[in-house]
């Protein structure tokens, strides 16, 4: 759960009973996919050795792209011991994973209207800005300058906005500044 909440890209490889025993309440069987679904970005149960190279490449891609997060790859015992051939996939498009990268103009307009009506506006930023790269940090600086709103950040967002700027209140939280937490 921490890795998902903190946007930590991690691939976790777990073991499972042999494929023919899955769903039979076998000794040491665990519904890893079901248990980890709420706290992972994506998860896999590999039932064919030939799928393993593609699944591993997809898992690392999904863990590190978009909003980073944990991905679980559950490998049954018979697949762990199976022999297969490895060939790097040319492409590994994941049909079910397509993060939306463009902003929705209507939602942006609504956000601007809310900001204009706010009585005590404040930018509360986090690690998503840092993970989005230098362009996002530059756009954040431009937005703060344009609006004149004060800005604060979580621990994971430190560095996205310069601490020497007069609009900067400091970091939020238990170890943050009094101003940011007020």
Q: Where on the chain are the PLM-derived regions?
A:
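N-terminal alpha/beta PP-like core and its mobile active-site loop of ThDP/TPP-dependent enzymes
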Residues: 1-182
